[in-house]
Structure formats: C-alpha cells, structure tokens
C-alpha cells in the first residue's frame, strides 16, 4: 500500500478553501465548479496509471479527486458513489499493488484528523490532466479578474 501524507501547509490549504461560514450547499457548489473546470483539461479515460508516489491531492467533492504526482503531472480520479470524508481529508492512502493504480480494482482510504481510516473508496475512472493547459487557463482567469478589479 502506498501512502501519501500531506504536509500541514498543504492540508491547511485544501481545507481553507472553504470558509468557516460557508454552507454545505455552497461548499458542494464550489467543488462542482472546480471539478467541471479540471474536467475540461482531463483526457480520455485510462484503465490504469503509473504510481510510485504522490506530490499532493485536491478533493473535488465526495466523488472525485485531483491526484498530483508532481507539479507538472496530475490525474482526475472519479470515486465510487461517494467518499463522505474526502472533502475534509488530511491525507489519503492509495491501496494498490505494485507500481500501477487500476481503475475499478484499487481504492483510496481517506485519513482525517481524529478518525481511524475505515472507509475504502473504489477508484472508478482515471483521466490524465493537461496540467500545462490548466495552469495557463487559471493564470488567464486571474489576469481577467485582476483587470476587472482595477478597471484595466
């Protein structure tokens, strides 16, 4: 079993994207928007992906996960039904054999503060993400927001 631990800073940033006063419906909407954005840059479904270690992860609600293998390589994972603790995950464990993660066979285990890891959530779909294009679109969006806010 390969385990990816998230640094305190990375875990904080994943959780801090949701404000304390945010309603569950607003949080789900935010995850849905982010998942839709990431999906635009996700390629064709793959039956498996190489896996040696992870760099980071980003929950996209309780049914999807953006798994970063490096700053320039990521995969969009769709998860079976739903994985209720995924949005508040401090870390995840990828339960696989060898150096490959297989859709429909392998699972993730969500690790949260104060809870033992009991839920295994099956990986249904694996899609590679065009990280370069996604980051360019994010940068362009920030520039548009900046120009709109400054009147430029």
Predicted features and spans:
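Ligand/cofactor-recognition surfaces for anionic moieties
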Residues: 20
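Positively charged n-region of N-terminal signal peptides that target proteins for export
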Residues: 1-5
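Bacterial N-terminal signal peptides
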Residues: 7-17
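Generic detector of short, well-ordered, non-transmembrane alpha-helical segments enriched
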Residues: 15-17, 50, 122
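Helix-rich interaction surfaces within compact, conserved domain-sized segments
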Residues: 83-152
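N-terminal secretory signal peptides
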Residues: 23-87, 143-152
């Amino acid at each position: 079993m390969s385990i990816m631990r998230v640094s305190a800073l990375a875990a904080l940033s994943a959780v801090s994207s949701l404000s304390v006063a945010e309603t569950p419906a607003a949080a789900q909407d935010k995850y849905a928007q982010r998942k839709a954005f990431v999906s635009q840059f996700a390629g064709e479904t793959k039956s498996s992906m190489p896996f040696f270690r992870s760099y980071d992860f980003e929950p996209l609600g309780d049914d999807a996960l953006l798994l970063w293998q490096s700053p320039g390589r990521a995969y969009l994972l769709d998860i079976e039904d739903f994985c209720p603790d995924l949005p508040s995950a401090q870390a995840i464990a990828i339960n696989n054999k060898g150096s490959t993660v297989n859709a429909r066979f392998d699972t993730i285990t969500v690790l949260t503060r104060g809870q033992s890891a009991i839920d295994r959530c099956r990986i249904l779909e694996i899609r590679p993400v065009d990280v370069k294009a996604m980051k360019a679109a994010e940068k362009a969006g920030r520039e548009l927001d900046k120009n709109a806010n400054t009147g430029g």
